[in-house]
Amino acid sequence: IIGAGIAGASLAWRLARAGRPVVLIEREPQPGMHSTGRSAAMFMESYGPPGVRALTRASRDFYLHPPAGFAEAPLLSPRHALFVATAGQQAALGRMQADLAASGTTMTLLNSELLAQAAPALKPDLFQNALLDEQGYDMDVHALLQGFLRGARQAGARLLTGVQPLRAAHDGQRWRVALSDG
């Protein structure tokens, strides 16, 4: 697997736990230095198109109840989010609320008075109302990445850092990868 960010580490964890031989290759001196390390790290079933929301819902149980020993602290902590709307965005906000409700995600509609109480920094003359998502979470991306890496190694995966793949070829049974360190 090339890349030891969250995607590569989670794949290594799954494959190694399934008994597959895994080598995880990372060009940086440590995993998670790029997009994983800069992730906004929100878990929101209300975010994204329907396919993304379905994947988010499907992963909720894992994040709330990871396998024993996966992480020392919870991976998720509650975080509310607001979707604000100007006067011209009311119809879109209504469609969003209906679309989310159809997939089982309930949101609370805040009028301008409740919105001003919830977010006093927002300009009350600009935003008419908002949807409040009380089912969102902050994700501990570092704990998640470390859980995947630790679990992958415990299941036999090897992690190589500071090397780059130069060429790769499949021989019919496995991949052979030439690395920058020889």
What are these language model-derived features?
Residues 18, 103, 154-155:
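Conserved dinucleotide-binding and phosphotransfer motif residues
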Residues 3-9, 27:
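Glycine-rich Rossmann-fold phosphate-binding loop(s) that bind the pyrophosphate
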Residues 16-36:
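Glycine-rich FAD pyrophosphate-binding loop
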Residues 131-181:
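Helical element adjacent to the flavin cofactor pocket in flavoenzyme catalytic cores
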Residues 28-30, 115, 148:
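Short beta-to-alpha linker loops that shape the active-site pocket of alpha/beta-hydrolase fold enzymes
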Residues 12, 16, 151:
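Gly/Ala-rich phosphate-binding loop of Rossmann-like dinucleotide-binding domains
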Residues 40-118:
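Dinucleotide-binding Rossmann-like beta1-alpha1 core, especially the glycine-rich loop
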Residues 26, 111-112, 161-163:
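Short loop/edge segments at beta-strand edges and connector loops
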